[in-house]
């Protein structure tokens, strides 16, 4: 039914307000995201947030393992050029770890403990990590949670500034530059916003209210 509704929305907007673009957000692995573009004959969304690549990129930072990201990019590059992704590193929203866990199983990676590792890494709870993120929608029963944080804070710039450590600051900046370079070579439209355009670190003022 979702696809029928989106298809109807696309048809209506093309008649009533043809200047409007439909931007969809689907937190799933690439194979399950693609159908929301529809087909060339029956199009649905004009663009989709590239949520999965965003999450897979941060997975790559935390694991220093590029296999998942390469696997996903191989899928994306084979898609029709009419399918446009909106690519970003971070945004106003959290990171939901909707990775391709079926594919990751072959490497002995299980979903629940891996999500915990990623959340621990990006909160600076893993040795060698200077990331500073915060949990969102933490469910201790399901052992599932989402993660919030700006690119600068997740890359270690916040911690380096707090410690006044010049070496860590330089490393964090290199990490940010690398991720943005990768963002700009992806197929689609790159977007830098929600504080990332000025290297903003996390704002904790919400805790004071």
Predicted regions and their residues:
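Active-site and adjacent substrate-binding regions of carbohydrate-active enzymes
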Residues: 1-209
